[in-house]
């Protein structure tokens, strides 16, 4: 917003809640502090979140595909404070307590605190619905996260006062209707397990800007090219995030999975030009998400082949392994 203030042709209106979009008459209706207000538009780029009013208007206009899938899990944020000003765990690590169907994670903050998130089913014996009293909460943490509990002096107060939130994946298509386009969570809300929600929305901005450079003043071409480029990648990062939830809560505690990851890391280290992990492609490159998803699947197949054929001892034999990796790309 600070940058936008330098442009005289940009106006900002606060306390304007979008209520409806009239596509036929190209009008928007807002709820303001002074009552309802209707404005005409020439084009709209809607980034109004996972429960988008603009998307809702598109849903009711017909020929619009939409799905909203909730995980059976919710999440609650907790806190590990510093002790005598010092962090109580390694500040250069993501800490995970995998427990199969649920998990606790902790992320470091600059002030030496850790933001912890408990991902837990709503229902079941070990579900949020059964953790209502102090005794139940204490027993649960003593059973599953006793070492983390020792670092949480405010556990009970935070557990009772902090909300339990939902985890939802939103998919829809088309993102475009006439002079209107959806962007960000409004078009592709995802669960947080790859840490890519904000980044995927920023990628929307980059691609839309590219298409504006190519096709303006033809907004139809801009919007069509934008959604054609972004839709497959939005679906891919949604799938990747769901896959990573299973990996984080369950697979990181499986010895076979960890052995596969050990081989994968070795390949990444020895052959960085030929082998990049899915995580590296998603997090540290501009590789489109759908390509990263496909390459990750190929990587898994390749590592499993190495294990099945007992080729681990050949990983450092450069001629053999470079040839082996090259065959993957044929």
Segments (PLM) and residue ranges:
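Conserved FAD-binding catalytic core of PHBH/FMO-like flavoproteins
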Residues: 5, 16-20, 25-167, 171-172, ...
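Surface-exposed helix-capping loop/turn segments at secondary-structure junctions
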Residues: 8-10, 149-152, 216-217
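A structural signal for well-ordered alpha-helical segments within the folded catalytic domains
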Residues: 52, 135, 203-206, 257, ...
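Conserved mid-domain beta->alpha element of the FAD-binding
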Residues: 45, 78, 161-253
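Non-transmembrane alpha-helical segments in soluble domains
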Residues: 1, 138-142, 227, 264
């Amino acid at each position: 917003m600070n940058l936008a203030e330098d442009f005289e042709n940009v106006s900002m209106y606060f306390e304007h809640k979008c209520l409806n979009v009239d596509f036929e008459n190209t009008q928007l209706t807002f709820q303001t502090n002074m009552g309802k207000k209707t404005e005409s538009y020439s084009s709209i780029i809607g980034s109004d979140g996972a429960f988008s009013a603009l998307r809702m208007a598109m849903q009711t206009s017909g020929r619009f595909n939409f799905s909203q899938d909730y995980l059976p899990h919710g999440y609650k944020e907790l806190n590990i404070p510093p002790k005598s000003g010092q962090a109580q765990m390694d500040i250069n690590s993501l800490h995970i307590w995998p427990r199969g169907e649920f998990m606790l994670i902790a992320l470091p903050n600059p002030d030496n605190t850790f933001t912890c998130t408990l991902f837990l089913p709503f229902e079941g014996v070990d579900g949020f619905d059964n953790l209502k009293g102090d005794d139940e909460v204490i027993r649960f943490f003593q059973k599953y996260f006793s070492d983390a509990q020792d670092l949480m002096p405010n556990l009970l107060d935070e557990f009772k006062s902090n909300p339990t939130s939902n985890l939802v994946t939103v998919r829809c298509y088309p993102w475009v209707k006439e002079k209107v386009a959806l962007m960000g969570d409004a078009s592709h809300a995802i669960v947080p397990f790859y840490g890519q929600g904000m980044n995927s929305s920023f990628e929307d901005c980059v691609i839309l800007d590219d298409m504006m450079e190519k096709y303006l003043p033809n907004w139809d071409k801009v919007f069509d090219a934008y959604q054609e480029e972004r839709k497959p990648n939005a679906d891919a990062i949604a799938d990747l995030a769901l896959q990573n939830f299973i990996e984080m809560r369950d697979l990181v505690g499986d010895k076979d999975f960890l052995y596969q990851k050990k081989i994968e890391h070795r390949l990444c280290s020895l052959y960085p030009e030929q082998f990049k992990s899915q995580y590296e492609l998603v997090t540290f490159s501009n590789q489109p998400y759908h390509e990263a998803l496909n390459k990750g699947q190929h990587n898994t197949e390749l590592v499993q082949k190495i294990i099945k054929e007992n080729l681990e001892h050949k990983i450092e034999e450069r001629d053999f392994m470079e040839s082996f990796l090259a065959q993957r790309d044929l």
